[in-house]
């Protein structure tokens, strides 16, 4: 119990590390919170025109979700604790203690924790994102579609209630963090992937 609780706390603290802010500082780029959508995420870093920085941000956000969950599996924790570790890492990204509890929208970190919980579920969610992105070129729509289907994939591929519950909570939080994007989608005003914009629209 103590070890599991410590891992949950560690997952939150790791999730709170903002890869986007770190990468932009090291690369001499503007703070992602002060440009584009204002969101510290890979899509907003991409809007600076630095694809390499965006890729590093994406990988960093994914890994900080993936690693704690893999550690939880390696330690033989029960599904309820693995789900708790996954949610803690995700919540750290959304509400980082190091940045005034104002974080990103969590799509890459969510993918990381899902891959950690069950690799096939993560790959199914990633495939969903890629297919929708290829058709629409809208990052938020791709993320929302993948989030919607993740609990379904989790149920079909694991049958574990705690993992399904984690998938539902992840999806709900992603929807909540994308509420402005949803309004723009309904108005047909959401920008496409790769567009440089000053609008507050980021995944």
Swiss-Prot record:
The keyword Phosphoprotein does not apply. Its main location: membrane. It catalyses: an acyl phosphate + sn-glycerol 3-phosphate = a 1-acyl-sn-glycero-3-phosphate + phosphate. The chain crosses the membrane at residues 3-23, 75-95, 113-133, 156-176. It is a multi-pass membrane protein. InterPro entries: G3P_acylTferase_PlsY. Pfam families: G3P_acyltransf. Catalyzes the transfer of an acyl group from acyl-phosphate (acyl-PO(4)) to glycerol-3-phosphate (G3P) to form lysophosphatidic acid (LPA). This enzyme utilizes acyl-phosphate as fatty acyl donor, but not acyl-CoA or acyl-ACP. This is Glycerol-3-phosphate acyltransferase. It comes from Thioalkalivibrio sulfidiphilus (strain HL-EbGR7). The lineage of its organism: Bacteria, Pseudomonadati, Pseudomonadota, Gammaproteobacteria, Chromatiales.
């Amino acid at each position: 119990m103590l070890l599991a609780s410590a891992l949950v706390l560690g997952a939150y603290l790791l999730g709170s590390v903002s890869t986007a802010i770190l990468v932009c500082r090291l690369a001499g780029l503007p703070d992602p919170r002060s440009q584009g959508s204002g969101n510290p995420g890979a899509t907003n870093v991409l809007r600076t025109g630095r694809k390499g920085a965006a890729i590093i941000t994406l990988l960093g956000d994914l890994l900080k979700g993936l690693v704690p969950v893999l550690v939880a599996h390696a330690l033989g924790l029960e599904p309820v604790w693995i789900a708790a570790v996954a949610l803690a890492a995700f919540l750290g990204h959304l509400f980082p203690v190091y940045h005034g509890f104002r974080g990103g929208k969590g799509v890459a970190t969510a993918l990381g924790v899902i891959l950690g919980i069950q690799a096939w579920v993560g790959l199914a969610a990633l495939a969903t994102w890629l297919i929708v992105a290829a058709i629409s070129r809208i990052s938020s729509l791709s993320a929302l579609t993948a989030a919607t289907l993740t609990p379904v994939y989790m149920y079909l591929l694991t049958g574990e209630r705690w993992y399904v519950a984690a998938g539902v909570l992840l999806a709900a939080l992603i929807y909540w963090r994308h509420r402005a994007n949803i309004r723009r989608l309904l108005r047909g005003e959401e920008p496409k992937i790769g567009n440089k914009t000053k609008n507050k629209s980021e995944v």
